[in-house]
Amino acid sequence: ASEIASLHNLSYYINKGERYGIPVLGVVAVGKEMERTTRYFALATRLLAEQGAHIIKTYYCENFEQITAACPVPIVIAGGKKVPEPEALDMAYRAVNEGAAGVDMGRNVLQAECPSAMLQAIRMVVHENVKPEAAYKAYQTLMKDVK
């Protein structure tokens, strides 16, 4: 859909959500040829918030703290492409420490060697501020317990 159609749809569903007390998640989409700059993400998250989204899902990028500082609603990061477990934990840690409210990871949890252990390690990083290295060690220990 075009950007204009997307904004109309967003506005429609935000109004419906408000009517029924349902929070709306705004998602910053990037196509293959769209830029992934701090400026783009800051503008897109701000636009979604000003349209009335209650929480925003976007990608982690350089200068992420500028994006979270400029956005008046909570931001969660998308997990993006599958990366090694230590990298996913590090990205989650940096994002939360730069202002993200949390993470929304799919393939970095579901495609991990042990998804349940990875989910617990991500929780440790996001909710307990455990450093990525310690969370990865916990992941390795939890993997042994599952097997």
Place the predicted regions along the sequence by residue.
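C-terminal helical cap(s) of enzyme catalytic domains, especially alpha/beta-barrels
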Residues: 96, 110-147
